[in-house]
Amino acid sequence: ALHAGIDLVLELPFLFATQNAERFSDAAVCILKYMQAQNLVFGSESGELTPLKRIAKILLHPDQAHFKQERSIGYARQMENTLLNTPELIPYIKHPNHILGIQYIRSILAQNAKILPITIQRKGSSYHHSEIVNTGFSSATAIRKLLFEERKVTSKIQTAVPEMTAKILNQVENYIDWNTLFPYLQIKVATNSANCLKQHLLVHEGIENRIKKIIP
């Protein structure tokens, strides 16, 4: 990032960088607030800030009784149900960049941070587009997919990422993907009871039983 022209890079600790959007954004805003940042700029599919602000305010003060009643259906569905009275906002929670942007704004409000949220409309491929495009910007999903398939930096990848990124990727001897890590997860699941798995962060609402059932 520094070689690409960024002035300062702040690390989001691994503990928070690997969490869901809510925890990710809480930690990120906390760091920015401490650094006295004035703006938080994020990409979004629509480039519209007003609807994202409306959703963030609704999520900041949800109907707690409603959430408790619907807990078994999961947080994503709860979020959608919370917006039933404002159906025009529901399409905005269907996109990954919108979801993170909403959580950034919610975190700013929750922490009373003097930070101005700004959004830039995403250009090029959508986040989940799986093919490299010849013009415009390719998605991170497409770049990762091709990198894991080819196991090297091809000319297509070179055209899709900054020069310094391509150089760093060329130095990697072994690209680790989920298939590489899955056997270790299998061992963990096989050697631990459901009650033990339940002690892990965000493993709740019976998901430990489903994990034991579907992972041999």
Model-derived features: where do they sit?
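Active-site cores that bind ATP or allylic diphosphates and position pyrophosphate for catalysis
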Residues: L8-P216
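Histidine-anchored nucleotide/phosphate-binding helix
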Residues: L2-H3, I105
